[in-house]
UniProtKB/Swiss-Prot annotation:
Species: Mycobacterium tuberculosis (strain ATCC 25618 / H37Rv)
General remark: Was identified as a high-confidence drug target.
Role, per record: The antigen 85 proteins (FbpA, FbpB, FbpC) are responsible for the high affinity of mycobacteria for fibronectin, a large adhesive glycoprotein, which facilitates the attachment of M.tuberculosis to murine alveolar macrophages (AMs). They also help to maintain the integrity of the cell wall by catalyzing the transfer of mycolic acids to cell wall arabinogalactan and through the synthesis of alpha,alpha-trehalose dimycolate (TDM, cord factor).
Chief location bin: secreted
Intrachain disulfide bonds: C127-C132
GO biological process: positive regulation of plasminogen activation; regulation of growth rate; response to antibiotic; response to host immune response
GO cellular component: extracellular region; peptidoglycan-based cell wall; plasma membrane
Listed name of the protein: Diacylglycerol acyltransferase/mycolyltransferase Ag85B
Gene Ontology molecular function: any one: trehalose O-mycolyltransferase activity
Gene designation: fbpB
Enzyme class of the recorded protein, top EC level: transferase
Reactions catalysed: 2 alpha,alpha'-trehalose 6-mycolate = alpha,alpha'-trehalose 6,6'-bismycolate + alpha,alpha-trehalose; an acyl-CoA + a 1,2-diacyl-sn-glycerol = a triacyl-sn-glycerol + CoA
Length: 325
């Protein structure tokens, strides 16, 4: 086979994958905020609070679900998926996360809302099917919320963790890259870790349009804008390595196991994002990184059963890394 033939076949494969993703992805993104699973919602009796935290940058109060880990405890911020709801955080809807981390010495912080936001500070108002609002989520999570929690709930404003699934996995990495004093730990579960590359901006735009009618250009501008690379975890590996951020990176391969998630959309999407995770690992190792857990099992689909299992599995690592006691 000639070099030209190889290149043609390679481009053909990329085109087929990209076309399939463009057709299927908008219908899949709901998986990141789908129906509740067994054991969802915190049980009665747990000390879960429903806070209204002022956000001057967004011009409104933001609902935050909160469970204290004790005075001066480090915080674990659990960030939601693309279809984040305005009533409850997906981690509470779909997993017993508050139960798992009760009396762990860690304060659990679940911001509510932020559909399609990537927990970022948007260039323009976030205008979707429900109207327009200001999205300054990075400012809220790294300034307004930690200050409020420190003053009102005795939570340490530094030495925290950000854990996110799908959309929010890349967000967790970026928060840690640019705010290393606050976030010394970042967990990414089934995320696209090179959103600025290739068809990433176009596919993200399609997904955001389906999840609320939002526009990616309102978030980070056109694909040529520096904001795309600024918010690309793979591009920010040098910062994560220099910060010595503790990382937990998980992605399945689209094959279901006994946990469930046996449906074609969940299988396709997990397999689709896996390659970006493997590339991230290679780039991280090449940059001299040595403070990460990479978990890429030969199973796992894009569904809450697997993300919940990972949150449970990382509990000891979080306690050790954050100094919970």
């Amino acid at each position: 086979m000639t070099d030209v033939s190889r290149k043609i076949r390679a481009w053909g494969r990329r085109l087929m994958i990209g076309t399939a993703a463009a057709v299927v992805l908008p219908g899949l993104v709901g998986l990141a905020g789908g129906a509740a699973t067994a054991g969802a919602f915190s049980r009665p009796g747990l000390p879960v609070e429903y806070l209204q935290v002022p956000s001057p940058s967004m011009g409104r109060d933001i609902k935050v679900q909160f469970q204290s880990g004790g005075n001066n405890s480090p915080a674990v911020y659990l960030l939601d998926g693309l279809r984040a709801q305005d009533d409850y955080n997906g981690w509470d809807i779909n997993t017993p996360a508050f139960e798992w981390y009760y009396q762990s010495g860690l304060s659990i912080v679940m911001p509510v809302g932020g559909q399609s936001s990537f927990y970022s500070d948007w260039y323009s108002p976030a205008c979707g099917k429900a109207g327009c609002q200001t999205y300054k989520w990075e400012t809220f999570l790294t300034s307004e919320l930690p200050q409020w929690l420190s003053a009102n709930r005795a939570v340490k404003p530094t030495g925290s963790a950000a854990i996110g699934l799908s959309m929010a996995g890349s967000s967790a990495m970026i928060l840690a890259a640019y705010h290393p004093q606050q976030f010394i730990y970042a967990g990414s579960l089934s995320a696209l870790l090179d959103p600025s590359q290739g068809m990433g901006p176009s596919l993200i735009g399609l997904a955001m349009g389906d999840a609320g009618g939002y526009k990616a250009a309102d978030m980070w501008g056109p694909s040529s804008d520096p904001a795309w690379e600024r918010n690309d975890p793979t591009q920010q590996i040098p910062k994560l390595v220099a910060n010595n951020t503790r990382l937990w990176v998980y992605c399945g391969n689209g094959t279901p196991n006994e946990l469930g998630g046996a449906n074609i959309p969940a299988e396709f999407l997990e397999n689709f994002v896996r390659s970006s995770n493997l590339k991230f690992q290679d780039a991280y190792n090449a940059a001299g990184g040595h403070n990460a857990v990479f978990n890429f099992p030969p199973n796992g689909t894009h569904s809450w059963e697997y993300w919940g299992a990972q949150l449970n599995a990382m509990k000891g690592d979080l306690q050790s890394s954050l100094g919970a006691g």
